């Protein structure tokens, strides 16, 4: 049996390294439990990390204007940074990895894309699926600032893709 497991790992290394976390919930369930929630703009990225400009700290403490956020691949349960193009804005719920770096997880909805004056993602939906929601950005920012006290009323808008 051990030989079969080893053979499988050698022949399919991607499968052996796949993320195994379960989706723990929408933005409204996971965001307030993180170290830092920011409104940010992506400056640049390389293979597995991105530099973001902090436009506003919504929750937590961060004095730097530019921070590093780790992305990843299928093996480390972090999203590929290619999904965050330079120049785009996001509401990011981040976990501190060390004194200088934050991490972003795929194990819940830890980011919302900013599209004009709207925030888009899985905001309140209790199950992971193709449907995304949209809410006024000002309402989402207010919700985070209030510690989840203010009301959010997102609406379903689109499919998340293939």
What are these regions (language model features)?
Residues 48-71:
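OB-fold (S1/OB) nucleic-acid-binding surfaces
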Residues 13-15:
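N-terminal signal peptide c-region/cleavage motif recognized by signal peptidases
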Residues 1-4:
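Positively charged n-region of N-terminal signal peptides that target proteins for export
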Residues 33-55:
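Structural detector for short beta-strands of small beta-barrel domains
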Residues 24-28, 39, 78:
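Short secondary-structure capping/turn segments at boundaries of alpha-helices and beta-strands
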Residues 77-162:
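Netrin-like (NTR/C345C) domain of secreted extracellular proteins
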């Amino acid at each position: 049996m051990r030989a079969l497991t080893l053979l499988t790992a050698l022949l399919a290394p991607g499968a052996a390294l796949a993320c195994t976390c379960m989706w723990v919930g929408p933005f409204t369930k996971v965001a307030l439990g993180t170290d830092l929630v920011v409104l940010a703009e992506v400056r640049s990225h390389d293979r597995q990390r991105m530099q973001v400009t902090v436009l506003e700290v919504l929750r937590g403490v961060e004095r730097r204007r530019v921070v590093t956020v780790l992305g990843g691949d299928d093996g480390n349960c972090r999203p590929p940074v290619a999904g965050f193009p330079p120049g785009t804005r996001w509401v990011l719920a981040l976990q501190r990895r060390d004194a200088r770096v934050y991490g972003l997880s795929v194990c819940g909805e830890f980011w919302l894309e900013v599209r004009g004056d709207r925030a888009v993602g899985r905001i309140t939906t209790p199950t992971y699926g193709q449907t995304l929601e949209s809410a006024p950005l000002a309402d989402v920012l207010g919700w985070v600032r209030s510690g989840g006290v203010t009301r959010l009323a997102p609406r379903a808008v689109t499919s998340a893709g293939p």
